[in-house]
């Protein structure tokens, strides 16, 4: 195998591009500060007073700051209304942005890049908007198009116009207009076992985790099952025992000087509040908050967040179990009583893709008895089982007798008392190819009877 340092090459290219970009941006800012001091003061006052930029002054600002980060509302309130004002406008989390919110940006852009995921949460405000009022306004929009643009109701354009509805996200609308669409398959946040649930149930097993797990599976996935003490919880949808156990585990982490970031995710708002209160009341809360960046979320509020370690508090016990009200009873089949199944599935996808280093599942009821969500826990149980399973001779390259002997030697060695994980046929070439399109697997020379040779990829 040739000497190949992908990370070194990638880092060098990124460093060069970053320096080049910083040089260009810094030179523009310095030029603006040196040659337009009075304009800088005027613009500073305009920004402080939150007034709309004058067209001529905004042109100076655009040249000095070619890259701007702002909210969608800012386009309408401060930036002049003019076509093609920006070369490219990028909208992130587009599934959460309604068409109405995005219009001020669309009108000012030459090109649009829209990033989003329909399998995660959409816009809450538009989903709660009055359908009757929306239909009335939308009818007026279609009538205006038919009248002013002479568009027939059967025209192809009118089919696209149907997507121009406040109840749709800008992601859904742009899908009907875009000339290029691609699925981002590479996952950089967590290990393959951590993202495997979302990849299997939501993305057809297409996600490619870029992090290679170099530690034991127990350090990545952990189950903590509590024997519920039948304690009566004052508030509904709470489990004080789980909250206290999570606090205990976090304090142990602090004692071990493990300062990886931490969050707790739970299906119920009441449990989120209880966990937040228990942590806040503890004497070391300031240390936990600052060192571990601790926060508590519900399945509905964790989108866009990430932490090194995620604790999941499922709340359900033998005495009470309302998981069915928040999570799907089955990932494959819809229950007759489930009216909001799509929202429940989105919760699952969002919540179980927040972790970077470790997922810890804290539950007070046997998985098989849970009213909902059991499939996700069984999935991760299987991931642990598969990782710990000892490979057999059938798992190695059948064309290589030496590999079978090496596997037997490992099984007979002293290292086995440490319960190691053995991964036969680790596809390092496939992994390198997934992170570098220019990578080519090395070739070996294979001799054939009768003389001659043929080159084949390893």
Annotate each predicted stretch with a short phrase.
Residues 1-85:
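Conserved helicase NTPase catalytic core signature
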Residues 47-202:
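ASCE P-loop NTPase helicase motor core
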Residues 58-64, 285-310, 317:
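Conserved motor-coupling elements within RecA-like helicase/translocase cores
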Residues 84-90, 305-317, 322-332, 358-360:
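A short beta-strand element within the Helicase C-terminal
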Residues 128-182, 283-284, 322-432, 436:
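Helicase C-terminal subdomain and adjacent C-terminal extension
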Residues 199-280:
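Conserved helicase/translocase motor-coupling segment
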Residues 434-458:
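Short beta-strand-loop-alpha-helix junction that forms the active-site gateway
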